[in-house]
């Protein structure tokens, strides 16, 4: 963010010290509302509250403690500040967070297709009518960025093994929530118990913000280790699978898996593995994942040409496949235990 702001200032864009501080604070705090395991468990822990709502609540609480020092950061975060480009640097289809995590995750996952010209893109940023734009000579870098984003989602973030593990994690929390709701003795930290019992759903965010802030991955990891020996066969089986990386097999398809096939495989799980019907439903299930890599109906990535003409990358690009770029991609998954692969 600091580098992007400096590039804009060097090009004559007026950004005050207060605005720079506000934008940097906004980008540092904008994901503060993510809980353990980030997006994977966003709807499994603090149900009914998005991470954006939590981020704003944290920022407002900090602002009270800091005597209003974050007023500008909050305005930028909420897109209520007149210099729209500052919000776009924090949250848009070309925000610095996306640039950062694509660059970082490509490196650490070893997926070369996710590599982007980060420095080049930042140097091509400009402002026109208070909106963030990209100079025309940066169009190829933006094309590569969008292609890299698409590749990273389907090769890394939504890889079938990731989908299978993530769905197992969600199912484990769901089963634990059911047991806690039935008053079945189930080990949890006091913080995790608060959310599994649904108490947060009955109280305002501000009243449980400190409890949420105390949660981290270890609350979940320790619980899963303990639950591996829980008397409930469903919870213990799922936790042992995750602990020992005996992950469910996941199939991905461009078409939905038929209810008949899912029902058939569930029946095989019951017959060959001796599982109850509810247990089979936890280890054999189908669903879908979707992703949109670029939405021309939202704030567009605009390219600035020499005659001051602005054009959406969607139409300005000669290389990108428009239908593949703009359409929401939906893929269907089907998860089941590897042990029954011989019978299906």
Regions found by a protein language model. Give the residues of each.
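Histidine-centered, transition-metal-coordinating active-site segments
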Residues: 1-22, 32, 36-344
């Amino acid at each position: 963010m600091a580098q992007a702001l400096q590039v804009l200032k060097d090009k004559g864009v007026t950004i005050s010290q207060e605005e720079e501080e506000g934008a940097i604070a906004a980008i540092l705090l904008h994901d503060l509302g993510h809980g353990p395991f980030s997006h994977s468990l966003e709807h499994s822990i603090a149900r009914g509250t998005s991470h954006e709502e939590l981020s704003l609540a944290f920022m407002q609480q900090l602002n009270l403690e800091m005597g209003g020092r974050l007023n500008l950061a909050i305005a930028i975060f909420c897109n209520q500040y007149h210099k729209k480009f500052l919000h776009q640097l924090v949250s848009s289809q070309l925000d610095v967070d996306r640039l950062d995590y694509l660059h970082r995750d490509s490196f650490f996952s070893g997926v070369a297709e996710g590599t982007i010209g980060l420095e080049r893109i930042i140097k091509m940023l400009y402002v026109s009518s208070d909106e963030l734009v990209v100079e025309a000579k940066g169009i190829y870098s933006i094309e590569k960025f969008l292609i890299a984003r698409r590749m990273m989602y389907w090769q890394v973030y939504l890889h079938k093994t990731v989908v299978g593990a993530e769905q197992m994690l969600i199912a484990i929390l769901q089963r634990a929530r059911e047991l806690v709701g039935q008053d079945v003795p189930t080990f949890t930290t006091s913080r995790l118990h608060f959310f599994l019992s649904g108490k947060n759903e009955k109280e305002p965010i501000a009243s449980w913000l400190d409890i949420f802030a105390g949660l981290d991955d270890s609350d979940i990891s320790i619980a899963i280790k303990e639950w591996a020996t829980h008397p409930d066969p469903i919870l213990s089986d799922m936790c042992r699978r995750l602990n020992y990386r005996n992950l469910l097999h996941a199939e991905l398809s461009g078409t939905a898996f038929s209810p008949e096939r899912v029902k058939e495989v569930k029946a095989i799980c019951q017959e060959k593995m001796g599982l109850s019907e509810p247990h089979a439903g936890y280890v054999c299930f189908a669903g879908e994942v979707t992703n949109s890599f670029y939405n021309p109906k939202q704030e567009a990535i605009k390219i600035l040409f020499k005659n001051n003409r602005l054009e959406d990358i969607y139409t300005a690009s000669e290389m990108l496949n428009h239908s593949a770029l703009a359409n929401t991609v939906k893929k269907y998954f089907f998860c089941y235990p590897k042990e029954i692969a011989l019978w299906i």
